[in-house]
Design a protein with these regions (language model features):
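Intrinsically disordered, low-complexity linkers and terminal tails enriched in Ser/Thr/Pro/Gly
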Residues: 1-109
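Short, composition-biased motifs enriched in small/polar/acidic residues
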Residues: 86-181
């Protein structure tokens, strides 16, 4: 943190790992973390433009890594979300735990929408429902499902662009596969 006194006042009881002279520019950059010997532990780039979570673009929620225990690729925007609270939750989590039951009820906050004009599939996710992975799929026969042909576009609701399913055929079906992480 840059100002340990201000941080301690805003987040009492949260341990501070160290101080940082600069500041993130909220415009996207390379983040590199090194150990005391100068050896790189982690390096990744982030951005404040889509497909990165746009609600975490300064002045409100912070970026939160989804399911950090699963060692996700930090450089992929779909592995991040906006925090549920302004400023984030340093030293704590805002993840809503999954305790069994219907995965769709746990993970989705609204309807799944297919827009054939823009060729997008979108879904509003429950804030903090990090215990699941959402995977868009398409089929022409409701038996064989394909996961290829989608581009993650980001946003809230989350959107996927559809670029390779055979639009124009007599039948085309879409769904979201929801599975535990």
């Amino acid at each position: 943190v840059r100002d340990p006194v201000a941080f301690a006042a805003a987040h009492p009881g949260v341990a501070i790992a160290g101080t940082f002279e600069g500041a993130l520019n909220n415009g996207g950059e390379l983040v590199a973390i090194s150990d005391s010997q100068g050896d790189e532990i982690l390096a990744f780039s982030y951005d404040n433009d889509l497909p990165w979570p746009d609600r975490a673009d300064g002045g409100g929620p912070s970026l939160v890594l989804i399911a950090p225990g699963s060692a996700p690729d930090h450089g992929l925007p779909q592995n991040w979300r906006a925090s549920t609270a302004p400023g984030g939750t340093p030293g704590d989590t805002d993840t809503v735990s999954y305790h069994g039951g219907d995965l769709l009820t746990y993970s989705l906050a609204g309807p799944v929408i297919l827009d054939v004009l823009t060729k997008t599939l979108s879904a509003s996710l429950m804030p903090g429902a990090d215990g699941v992975e959402i995977i868009p799929q398409w089929s022409t026969d409701l038996v064989h499902w394909n996961e290829d042909g989608f581009d993650y576009l980001g946003g809230e609701p989350r959107q996927w662009g559809i670029h390779s399913p055979p639009f124009g055929g007599s039948r085309l079906f879409f769904r979201l596969r929801v599975q535990e992480r």
